[in-house]
UniProtKB/Swiss-Prot annotation:
Residues 553-568 have a biased composition (Basic and acidic residues). This is B-cell scaffold protein with ankyrin repeats. Residues 25-153 form the TIR domain. It is linked to Systemic lupus erythematosus: A chronic, relapsing, inflammatory, and often febrile multisystemic disorder of connective tissue, characterized principally by involvement of the skin, joints, kidneys and serosal membranes. It is of unknown etiology, but is thought to represent a failure of the regulatory mechanisms of the autoimmune system. The disease is marked by a wide range of system dysfunctions, an elevated erythrocyte sedimentation rate, and the formation of LE cells in the blood or bone marrow. It comes from Homo sapiens (Human). Keywords: ANK repeat, B-cell activation, Phosphoprotein, Repeat, Systemic lupus erythematosus. Residues 200-327 form the DBB domain.
Length: 785
């Protein structure tokens, strides 16, 4: 019996008929029990907390059952139903309780029956019209068994389960099988108790040249130091054996006189096991050898066959997934223990002693290929060891296994070569470097004239170098390594010049994601800097109209470029947003001009560190319309302004005039365009360098605009005060205001801007309003005309 949970004695308060229902989908375990099994329910709750949370467990006392609980608590939705079957539950069963249990326990694969004080669950399932549960545990098992059963039910998605429906007439037979299985388990437990704690092999040792002995322990040794004490009638010796594995220890046998010797195994100074061995004189050993030779070595052969069968059975049932590993080299030094050098693996041991069945089983384990080829300190593999010890049949098994492995490897190599050949037919780039040279030139047509020519010159030289480098591929070499190297070199996103000039080194970091070559070239050479400086890209763009790749936009391309033009059109259907950074006059690109001009074409850091691309831009730039020269516009505006000055004071300006003043033509001429652009560029540079956030830059630019507009309003106010002062001092001149208007508006740009500010400024109370001035001095604009 398992001990009851600590602190859960009989004096504990009675819990509720059922615990709180787990919230949401955390419904893993429901335990159904009667009052006499309450302690077991509480104990199992503590055990199952290692697997599930406390909220996922529901304790349901059956004496307070109700059919409404099936819907309110959703009892049938739990993954695992654990029924604690006790005598009280069987005694108090009623038809309603049976019906209630049938609805909860309808799925046998999710039901676990815990036998608590009863021998079998047959009596319960005879009263219920459902199949017997698949899982049945008892109170005599360990907590690990309970956890493993619960895990197999809750996490059943990872395994295949099937439902077994046992007919009524076969339940007796099934219960008999369960009882037989229990008897077998009891017998195995009893036989385990009869196994001695330690066994020394061989049990009989010759007095002269005793050789090695092996000490086999039933249980693993947890302590740090293990000592073996040999005691005879007149001699006692204690020594430390060598570790073979967790349960087997090896040492050289000590020389004792003929007779019995007691062996005590100490672990950290405490006796763990006791056994006895026997020493016999040399004459008796010779008699035994002659007797074995006369009987045809039947005794030795029978013992070897029995050992072979026992070891094979142990490996098949106890260690089904054995894997060859050099564990002994990690535990002990090979220089100190020579048997590791002679028999490095169990396969060598089976070859030496002729354990045929064990060798066949080991050859099916993981790592058997290298274990069969591994040589000991004498340079012998398992096949040679079996031949040296006269095991011809075992030697043939090893040789057949080696031949089979060679055939499998050859088939894999042939399949690999066929895959490479079929792969190379679909990708001609692996065999024709000149094809990549043509595609490189196609990608490079969108670059500017000067650098495109330089790249073509370098590409030809590097292309010839690539042809000489990969010439074995053209001759017909089938080397898979060269082919994969060639594929790696010609990734479209990689830089072909860098790949051809610098060999691929294993110490280099992995390459970035592939990108089109043309896009990389265009992004790494922006043509913009700050205003007021000469940019090389602008000069190159002016020369670029003579290049065939640019001339195709205007329709003047030669006939030899038609095929390339068609290919470019297909490529332009899926253009990268970065492609047009070189032909658009955008402030976004002007920010990174100084950084980008210093970088070379082969550099990758500029592309990686560049911020996200803006909105995709149009594929072509419409030609700019012919505009009137600036000086002509100024004189035209002067003329138009003189004609409209006569109607200044007749009324407020019309909406059409306001619209004309705020038209795009005047907005481009409105002041401080260059200053605003410079201020915006400086702020954007600070944002890109991380010195300022985007919100701070926007706020600063707004303050700058407000400061600019404030200065202009102050100038307008001063100008208006000057006009009023002049008009107030010289009231006799009626046309003085018109003259001042002409004098203070020399250009259309300033006129439009100042008038706009003039009509929008609110006059203060200190100065007289304009209608009062006209009324006071008695002049009107219509008198002159």
């Amino acid at each position: 019996m398992l001990p009851a949970a600590p602190g859960k004695g009989l004096g504990s308060p009675d819990p509720a008929p059922c615990g709180p229902a787990p919230p949401g989908n955390t419904k893993d375990i429901i335990m159904i029990y009667e009052e006499d099994a309450e302690e077991w329910a509480l104990y199992l709750t503590e055990v199952f907390l290692h697997v599930v949370k406390r909220e996922a467990i529901l304790l349901y006392r059956l004496e307070n059952f109700s059919f409404r609980h099936l819907e309110l608590l959703n009892l049938t939705s739990y993954k695992c139903k654990l029924l604690i079957l006790s005598n009280s539950l069987l005694r108090d069963l009623t038809p309603k309780k049976c019906q209630f249990l049938e609805k909860i326990l309808h799925s046998p694969k999710s039901v676990v029956t815990l036998l608590c004080g009863v021998k079998s669950s047959d009596q319960l399932y005879e009263l219920l019209n459902i199949s017997q549960s698949r899982w049945e545990i008892s109170t005599e098992q360990e907590p690990e068994d309970y956890i493993s059963v619960i895990q197999s039910i809750i996490f059943k998605d990872s395994e295949d389960y099937f439902e077994v429906n046992i007919p009524t007439d076969l339940r007796a037979k099934h219960s008999g099988e369960i009882s037989e299985r229990k008897e077998i388990e009891e017998l195995s437990e009893a036989s385990r108790n009869t196994i001695p704690l330690a066994v020394v092999l061989p049990t009989e040792i010759p007095c002269e040249n005793p050789g090695e002995i092996f000490i086999i322990l039933r249980d693993e040794v947890i302590g740090d130091t293990v000592e073996v004490e040999f005691t005879s009638s007149n001699k006692r010796i204690r020594t430390r054996p060598a570790l073979w594995n967790k349960k087997v220890w090896c040492m050289k046998a000590l020389e004792f006189p003929a007779g019995s010797v007691h062996v005590n195994v100490y672990c950290d100074g405490i006796v763990k096991a006791t056994t006895k061995i026997k020493y016999y004189p040399t004459a008796k050993a010779k008699e035994c050898l002659f007797r074995m030779a006369d009987s045809g070595e039947s005794l030795c052969q029978n013992s070897i066959e029995e050992l072979d069968g026992v070891l094979t059975s142990i490996f098949k049932h106890e260690i089904p997934y054995y894997e060859f590993q050099s564990l002994q080299t990690e535990i002990c030094s090979q220089n100190k223990y020579t048997h590791f050098k002679e028999l490095p693996t169990l396969l060598h041991c089976a070859a030496k002693f002729g354990l045929k069945n064990l060798a066949i089983h080991l050859l099916q384990c993981s790592g058997a290929t290298w274990a069969s080829k591994m040589k000991n300190m004498e340079g012998s593999d398992p096949a040679h060891i079996a031949e040296r010890h006269g095991h011809k049949e075992l030697k043939k098994i090893f040789e057949d296994f080696s031949i089979q492995e060679i055939d499998i490897n050859n088939e894999q190599e042939n399949d690999y070569e066929e895959d490479i050949a079929s792969f190379s037919t679909y990708i001609p780039s692996t065999q024709n470097p000149a094809f990549h040279h043509e595609s490189r030139k196609t990608y490079g047509q969108s670059a500017d004239g000067a650098e495109a020519n330089e790249m073509e010159g370098e590409g030809k030289q590097n292309g010839s170098g690539m042809e000489t480098k990969h010439s074995p591929l053209e001759v017909g070499s089938e080397s898979s390594e060269d082919q994969y190297d060639d594929l790696y070199v010609f990734i479209p996103g990689a830089d072909p010049e860098n790949n051809s000039q610098e060999p691929l080194m294993s110490s280099r970091p992995p390459l970035p994601p592939p990108r089109p070559v043309a896009n990389a070239f265009q992004l790494e050479r922006p043509h913009f800097t700050l205003p007021g400086t000469m940019v090389e890209g602008q000069m190159e763009r002016s020369q670029n109209w003579g290049h065939p790749g640019v001339r195709q936009e205007t329709g003047d391309e030669p006939k030899g470029e038609k095929e390339k033009k068609e290919e470019e059109k297909e490529q332009e259907e899926e253009e990268d947003p970065y492609t047009f950074a070189e032909i658009d006059d955008s402030e976004y690109d002007m920010i990174l001009a100084n950084l980008s001009i210093k970088k070379k074409t082969g550099s990758r850091s500029f592309i990686i560190n560049r911020p996200p691309a803006p909105t995709p831009r149009p594929t072509s730039i419409p030609p700019k319309e012919e505009t009137t020269p600036y000086i002509a516009q100024v004189f035209q505006q002067k003329t138009a302004r003189r004609q409209s000055d006569d109607d200044k004071f007749c009324g407020l300006p019309k909406k059409q005039d306001r619209a004309r003043i705020e038209s795009p033509a005047f907005s481009t001429l409105r002041g401080c365009l260059t200053d605003g652009q410079e201020e915006l560029i400086l702020l954007q540079e600070k944002v890109k360098n991380g010195k300022m956030s985007m919100d701070e830059a926007l706020e600063k630019f707004k303050h700058w605009q407000m400061g600019k507009s404030g200065l202009e309003m102050i100038q307008q106010e001063k100008l208006r005060q000057l006009r009023d002062c002049i008009i107030g001092k010289r009231p006799e001149e009626e046309n003085v205001y018109n003259k001042l208007t002409i004098v203070h508006h020399p250009g259309g740009k300033e006129t439009a801007h100042n008038e706009n500010k003039f009509y929008n400024v609110h006059f203060s109370n200190k100065l007289p309003a304009r209608p009062q001035v006209e009324k006071e001095f008695g002049f009107c604009c219509k008198k002159d005309h």
